[in-house]
Swiss-Prot record:
Cofactor or coenzyme needed: pyridoxal 5'-phosphate
Protein's UniProt name: Probable glycine dehydrogenase (decarboxylating) subunit 2
Residue runs in coiled coils: none
Modified residues (N6-(pyridoxal phosphate)lysine): 264
Organism: Legionella pneumophila (strain Lens)
Transmembrane intervals: none
Extent of the signal sequence: none
Gene: gcvPB
Subunit structure: The glycine cleavage system is composed of four proteins: P, T, L and H. In this organism, the P 'protein' is a heterodimer of two subunits.
First-level EC class: oxidoreductase
Biological role stated in the UniProt entry: The glycine cleavage system catalyzes the degradation of glycine. The P protein binds the alpha-amino group of glycine through its pyridoxal phosphate cofactor; CO(2) is released and the remaining methylamine moiety is then transferred to the lipoamide cofactor of the H protein.
Keywords linked to the UniProt accession: Oxidoreductase, Pyridoxal phosphate
Length: 484
């Protein structure tokens, strides 16, 4: 039911908070509405019940196992949220002067240093407000670097065919042409093709390591050497940093710039359209181009660095500092776990993934790369299930919802047919993993004996199987278009 269907003329919810605006204040007539807004007329209780019921129908990390591949849906510790909500942080105004913000600035300065140590890169800017914006910032810095050297012929970015979709989008937004590099049969990047395509027009290469196939790129040092010898730079997509946290540093692999997804690796909240944060870390040669502001430390305390400090900066990406509340959560997460705790994060994440992969193959599923160990995630291919039972990966994904499990990432990466990309984060217990295996075993048995159950799934959710094509072509987004 939509909230408009609860509406009754004359019903209202009185505000219980005093108005901030004086009653004597009036909006100029030219800016005043000529008709009432079409808002539902409901009581406060109706509104609370309506949205509470909707929230109970959602899948969430707090309520369900959430093995969404390449998304690292780990638990968000409540103590971290509490620390980030201390009055000294949440009551600070974004325009507060440096001398009134020393505690806040010191915290961000320490976060910059922690990220530098984790990534093996000396420069850090916290200002990007999402992983995708951090990615854009990284590519923009690569462009600024080449332009400052007069190397304007470099107009190509190399990107593997298993990359995240944001990689080519960021490259194109910065004015580059995308050159795709194929994946070899063993899951690694095709080195021979890379050697053919790298050259004087190469500005850089964008990689995720481990890749989105759930495999660690074993020839990364050779790849770095090839690209650097050609005059290009290496960009690290931090989407899968959870797999190598404390074990391997991107800077030590030869990467020049990267972004971090705080909502993945450092347990800040996912989704909801924001807020987010995607800090960037850079090697020495890209420090002059970092987006502002960054925090610097002097004898007089902590201060915002300005364009005067970084005249070649690519500039601002957001108002103020970015999403400070998310940055604080990441800082306290690092502080709570410490160096040893962060190391265990990657160890348990890879242990969970490899255990789950092994158990799923025991009950009949096929690994996309059976000769390789998983990193923090892995891919099953349901090609044989489609051929034998006429059920698809999407059918399996929809049926999982009936068992209270959020579906894994489906049909991505595109180069694996009937693909399920599964990532069990380090916060999940062995009992939870075993329960998931039992559900997957049951669904596979259903596929072999009663495939129609899968084809019609989900059966228990308020929204059943949707007609994706019709939904895309016949948009119905306006309640009043059909309810005048």
């Amino acid at each position: 039911m939509l909230i408009f269907e609860l509406s009754k003329t004359g019903r209202q919810a009185k505000a219980q908070i005093p108005r901030a605006v004086s009653k004597n204040y009036s909006i100029p007539e030219e800016f005043q509405r000529k008709s009432r807004p079409r808002l539902p007329a409901c009581s406060e209780l109706q509104v609370v019940r309506h949205f509470t019921c909707l929230s109970q129908k959602n899948f969430s990390i707090d309520t369900n196992f959430y093995p969404l591949g390449s998304c690292t849906m780990k638990y968000n510790p409540r103590g971290v949220h509490k620390a980030a909500s201390l009055p000294g942080f949440i009551n600070r105004h974004p325009l507060a002067m440096d001398n009134e913000s020393q505690g806040f600035l010191e915290t961000l300065y320490k976060l910059q240093n922690y990220i530098s140590e984790i990534t093996g890169m000396p420069g850090v800017s916290l200002t990007p407000m999402a992983g995708s914006q951090g990615e854009f910032a990284g590519v923009a810095m690569i462009k600024a670097y080449h332009q400052s050297r007069g190397d304007t012929a470099r107009d190509e970015i190399l990107i593997p065919d298993a990359a995240h979709g944001t990689n080519p989008a960021s490259a194109v937004m910065c004015g580059f042409k995308v050159v795709e590099i194929a994946t070899a049969p063993d899951g690694d990047i095709d080195l021979d093709e890379l050697k053919r395509k790298v050259g004087p027009r190469t500005a850089g290469i964008m990689l995720t390591n481990p890749s989105t196939l759930g495999l660690f790129m074993r020839q990364i040092k050779e790849i770095a050497s090839l690209v650097h010898q050609a005059g290009g730079l290496l960009y690290y997509d931090g989407a899968n940093l959870n797999a190598i946290l404390g074990k391997v540093r991107p800077g030590d692999m030869g990467f020049d710039v990267m972004h971090l997804n705080l909502h993945k690796t450092f347990a800040t909240p996912h989704g909801g359209g924001g807020p987010g944060a995607g800090p960037v870390a850079v090697g020495k040669r890209l420090i002059p181009y970092m987006p502002l502001p960054v925090v610097k430390k002097t004898d007089s305390g902590y201060h915002w660095a300005t364009r005067q400090d970084y005249p070649q900066s690519i500039g601002r990406l957001s108002c103020f500092m970015g999403n400070a509340g998310i940055l604080l959560r990441a800082y306290f997460y690092m502080l709570v776990l410490g160096k040893e705790g962060l190391l265990r994060v990657s160890e348990f994440a890879t242990l969970n993934a490899n255990y789950l992969l092994k158990e799923l193959t025991k009950v009949g599923y096929t690994a996309a790369y059976p000769d390789r160990r998983a990193s923090h995630e892995f891919i099953l291919t349901l090609n044989s299930e489609k051929k034998n039972y006429d059920v698809t990966a999407m059918d399996f994904a929809k049926r999982l919802l009936d068992y209270g499990v959020h579906a894994p990432t489906t049909y991505f990466p595109l180069l694996v047919p009937e693909c399920l990309l599964i990532e069990p984060p380090e916060t999940e217990s062995k009992e939870e993993l075993d329960a998931f295996v039992a559900v997957m075993k049951t669904i596979r048995e259903e596929a072999s004996k009663q495939p129609d159950i899968l084809k019609a799934a989900p059966h228990t959710l308020p929204v059943k199987r949707l007609d994706d094509v019709k939904a895309a072509r016949e948009l119905d987004l306006n309640y009043f278009a059909t309810h005048e």
